[in-house]
C-alpha cells in the first residue's frame, strides 16, 4: 500500500490519529472514517485538491450528479422488474466553496458512483459522513455563577459568587454566530438582538426545538445571563430537535457563518455597518474525529472569525474529537464552582483554556422567559465565545477616528491565554494547560487588561520569592537571607 495515498493527506492523517483509511485502491482517493463516530450509511464528504478552481469544482459536481442520475435510473428499472426492496440514493446534498480555501461537496451515493468519484484526479480524499450531536448535559437546579467566576481572580466566596464585574459596553458591535440547534430569538433576555441566520438540515423549521442552542446563546449575549451583554446573536441551525445531525450539515453551517461574516466586513468597509467590530462563533457540539470539520473551522478562523469550541464531555483526550481538535479555534474545557476540572470534561494538549461548565443557568425554550440549568463543556465554550465578543467590543470600531489595526484571531487567542488565571484548578492532567478564563475584572481598557495581567504575573513571582526569603530568615539563615534580598533589590 506504500505510496498510494495522496502526499497532502498524509500529514492530516498523522494529526488526526482517530481517523482511519478504510479503503485504499491504486490511483484512487482514500476513503476516511473516524474510529469514534457513527457513520451515516452511503453518505460521503468529498474534498477537492488544492488548486482546483470553483469552475472545475462545479463541472465535477454536475458530472457526479449525472452519474448518480444514470445509476438511479438503472436501479429503478430493476426495481420495477423484480419484487425486492432496493434502496434509493439522494445524490448531491451540499456544495462547499469556502473563501477559496476549501472546495468540496457531500451527498448520498451508491457504491458504484463513489468508486468513480474517488478515481477523479481532482479529488484529494473522501470522508464518510457521520453523526454529530449536542454534548450531553445533566439538568439540575442551581443558580448562575459562571459570570462571577470569570470576572474574579480569586476563588469565589459568599460575597462574590453572584457578582459579575464587567464593562457595560461588552459585546457592542460584535456578531456572535451560534452553530447549534437554533436559538429562541424572541426570548426577552436577547432584547431584540437575536436573529435567525440559517437552517441547514433540509426540511427543518426555523426554530430551536431542543433548547441547547438557546442556552449557549444566552451565556454568550443575554442581558442577564450573558458575558457580552450587547452582542448580536445569529442562530445557525445545524442540529435537529433531537440534538443530532450530520457532519456535512455542520460543515455547511460553518461555511454559511464565515460567508456572512465576510459580507459584514465588506459592508463595514463601504460604511454600511456602522460600529461593526468583528464576528465570533461558538460550536458546543461534537462527534468523532473529522479531518474536514477541523479544516473548515481553521479556514473560518483564517478569514477572521474568532471561534470557541467545546472540548467534549468524555473525560478523554480532546484531540480525538472534532471540532475540539481544530488547531486555530479556542478549545474549552469545563470547570466547577470549587475550581476543579469538571468530572466529564475532556483534557489534553488540544484543550486551550477552561471556563465554568457545571450547573450553568441560562435562557431556554418554551416561552420568552424560560430558563434552565445544565452542565457540560457545551456551557463552558459560550463563556469563551462571549469573552471573545467582549474583548473585540473594547476596540475602536473600524469606522472610528480612533480605529486601530484589527486584532487577528491568533492574537486574540494568545492574549486570552496570556491573561488567564493560572494554576488554580485541581485535577488537571500534566499535559493540559491549567488556565481559567478571566475578563479583566471589569476594566474597559483592553491594552491595560493585557499589560496589567503580565505585570501581575511579574508581581506574583516577586511576591512568591519574597515569601520564600522571609521563610529563610525565620529559619535563622540570616546571612543567606540578606545576600539574596540584596540581590533582588539590585
UniProtKB/Swiss-Prot annotation:
Pfam families: Inhibitor_I9, Peptidase_S8. The keyword Secreted applies. It comes from the Eukaryota. This is Subtilisin-like protease 8. Residues 1-26 form the signal peptide. It is found in: Secreted. Belongs to the peptidase S8 family. It comes from Trichophyton verrucosum (strain HKI 0517). One of its GO terms (biological process) is proteolysis. Residues 144-450 form the Peptidase S8 domain. Keywords: Glycoprotein, Hydrolase, Protease, Secreted, Serine protease, Signal, Virulence, Zymogen. GO terms for molecular function: serine-type endopeptidase activity. SUPFAM superfamilies: Subtilisin-like (SSF52743). The active site is at residues 180, 212, 378. Glycans are attached at residues 282, 456. Secreted subtilisin-like serine protease with keratinolytic activity that contributes to pathogenicity. Its EC number is 3.4.21.-. Residues 27-134 form a propeptide. One of its GO terms (cellular component) is extracellular region. Residues 43-134 form the Inhibitor I9 domain. Its main location: secreted.
